[in-house]
Amino acid sequence: MAKKNAFYAQSGGVTAVINASACGVIETARGHKDKIGKIYAGRNGIIGALAEDLIDTGKDSAKAVAALRHTPSGAFGSCRFKLKGLEENRVQYERLIEVFKAHNIGYFFYNGGGDSADTCLKVSQISGKMGYPIQAIHIPKTVDNDLPITDCCPGFGSVAKYIAVSVREASFDVASMAKTSTKVFVVEVMGRHAGWIAAAGGLASDKNCELPIVILFPEIPFNKEKFLARVDELVKKHGYCSVVVSEGVKGEDGKFLSDQGLRDAFGHAQLGGVAPVVANMVREGLGYKFHWAVADYLQRAARHIASKTDVDQAYALGKAAVELALKGQNAVMPTVVRVSDKPYKWKVGVAPLGKVANVEKMMPRDFITKDGFGITEKCRAYLAPLIKGEDYPPYKDGLPQYVRLKNVAVPKKLVEFKL
């Protein structure tokens, strides 16, 4: 019987290290040629499987694949497309089986966040409910760091490092200008429901470099009066302050401060624009001159300042996914297990997808200071190891050198499928 081929795809928002996971998958699979045949990638996530838009990664050299480890974003294209349940849309699952059969695919690796875990779980059920043998392994990825069970999520450590460094540097800038100009700097970061990225801004200030920073978490209902009082207190004491605000901050009425009524493909509120809202509160309530910025894609694409810890974990979980599949596992996700804080040690674990899909991990209350505007030492102990270590990409003429794969299409064998 012919060796089964593997399918790998990327889903949801991309990160600085998702390609490191792809590198881990492809290199590990190539090392098991006795058990795995071809390694296909789906162009634009699960859509690539449904549309039979497959990429033959075998057309790329070992050197090119290795370069994925230091290349940001999604090498094969990503998507925001959520499979409906089997009962709701059986035709999508029949199509997946049709494509898998046509290309002899027996291994399914899906690299993404919570919604992607849900998609992977649904694909894993093809085996039991529809009789097609498939082993579906989810590879965690999300800058939001909100997947359960795993200690942290690949992608988070690097965005956390970017935010911590940026807040420290911007705070130095504001301090320089505060006497006659800007006194408050507001930066908006990602995080719809969980404040992990915003919390990373707290790392900018430590015992060797104390800085006046206010953090606004999604987990803490926003109180305008308390916020303005805290900003005013810090400006009067230090002459300036920096504010790190999560895009998902809600008022005490439960509504997003930045909700414009839009929704993304997963049905989530399309957020953004909370920084100017908060900055205007400072101007109107306190009269201080301000500047605001939105980190947006910059925070998750910044491979030049990636955390080595994050890169290593991303690669390790991609590698582990293949190893789990070869052991016969299905509907599972490799995880990061923290062994110790000092020294920081971790290992790879495994979690059932049923306990991961559609579950969000919020910031524990004891990670946030009593006033709701900062991080505790417990939080600092959790976050600090995740941003450690440098893993710079190669540079040429002052610019990082990233790889673009050939992404050669696999010839189609089936009729077109309308999504």
Whereabouts are the PLM-identified features?
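Short glycine-rich or small-residue beta-strand-to-loop segments that form or flank ligand, phosphate
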Residues: 5-15, 74-80, 106-112, 184-189, ...
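Short glycine/serine/threonine-rich phosphate/pyrophosphate-binding segments
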Residues: 15-25, 49-50, 91-94, 114-122, ...
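Accessory alpha-helical/coil subdomains and C-terminal extensions
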Residues: 99, 110-112, 120-130, 137, ...
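Glycine-rich oxoanion-binding loops at beta->alpha junctions
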Residues: 52-106, 115-116, 143, 168
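N-terminal phosphate-binding or glycine-rich loops at protein starts, especially the Walker A/P-loop
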Residues: 2-54
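Short, ordered loop/turn segments at secondary-structure junctions
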Residues: 11-13, 42-47, 80-81, 113-114, ...
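C-terminal non-catalytic interaction/assembly regions of soluble proteins
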Residues: 256-419
